């Protein structure tokens, strides 16, 4: 699969440069080592504060802080000082993985793995003759905090919002071990990809 080769080169290079979420590296390596599947853009879950010029203007939005671990209250306070123009939101998002399958049968297996691992928003669709499975959780939180550099909530409420956002992030991440276990079982069933082994050795030296 030419597409898998390109995806693996991109992944291994990003890992080498320290650009991949540390708590999801092992899972991504496992999935990509399986015959007939590979990952594209994926995230281990994140929480942060974002500034959007207007509702829905995601391409022009600006993260004031974005971390893949629980956020400290002091970090939120410091981030809000950078706010300037637009609507300010606190956002917490669960892990999300995009996995491409080589055929419909494999896509169905991946879909079932996502659901059985607790990722209830898992879906799959066909894009440019590729079966793309999106493994996604339900733990999304978006809280408006202010506008145009002005925070419109109390410090007490901000602390509460950060606590809830962190709890939702932890809940989403808590499903990753089960997902890993289920992909390990799939690997034992379908086997390891030789292309993965070769490129891993070539790029990462392991």
Swiss-Prot record:
Its job: S-adenosyl-L-methionine-dependent methyltransferase that acts as a component of the wyosine derivatives biosynthesis pathway.
Keyword presence, Chaperone: no
Catalytic function, reaction form: 4-demethyl-7-[(3S)-3-amino-3-carboxypropyl]wyosine(37) in tRNA(Phe) + S-adenosyl-L-methionine = 7-[(3S)-3-amino-3-carboxypropyl]wyosine(37) in tRNA(Phe) + S-adenosyl-L-homocysteine + H(+)
Keyword Methyltransferase included in the entry's annotation: yes
Gene Ontology biological process terms from the UniProt entry: tRNA methylation; wybutosine biosynthetic process
Species in which this protein is naturally found: Pyrococcus abyssi (strain GE5 / Orsay)
Alphabetized Gene3D superfamilies for the sequence: tRNA wybutosine-synthesizing-like (3.30.1960.10)
Pfam families hit by this protein: TYW3 (PF02676)
Enzyme Commission number, as recorded: 2.1.1.282
Listed NCBIfam families: PRK04235.1-2 (NF003264), PRK04235.1-6 (NF003267), tRNAMtaseTaw3 (NF047731)
Keywords per UniProt: Methyltransferase, S-adenosyl-L-methionine, Transferase, tRNA processing
One function term, GO molecular function aspect: tRNA methyltransferase activity
Protein name: tRNA(Phe) 7-((3-amino-3-carboxypropyl)-4-demethylwyosine(37)-N(4))-methyltransferase 2
UniProt enzyme class: transferase
Family named by the database record: Belongs to the TYW3 family.
